[in-house]
Amino acid sequence: MLSDMYVIDGCAFAEEDFTGVTQKVKDSPLTAFFLTTPGEDQGMLALAHNIGGIYNMADDPASGLMVVRTIAELEEAKAQGKIGVILGFQNPHCIENSLEKLRALYELGIRVVQMTYNKANYIG
């Protein structure tokens, strides 16, 4: 029955470089998780660097992970027995006041943006 369901963790957080998940997580029924991408409060360059590192890590078959940007990719990850990683951030500071940066982050795979957080930003 769980194999037919989608189990998604709504907020996984990595303070430093994201290095993957434990074997216990790999063995769980988790389908995907929203990952708060490290570097979100350090500006666009740091965030892009960390996103690249997450893609590189997920490219390793031993990671058991796949960055997912669409429902089709989520279904593909599930079919392959991988856990989907949905990239996002909790603090939109790195967008500054630029729709161009938001578009660039979307192209890099960011799919979740929390509009406000603990500190004031350009959005709220």
What are these model-derived regions, one by one?
Residues 1-124:
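N-terminal hydrophobic targeting/anchoring segments and the immediately downstream early-domain regions
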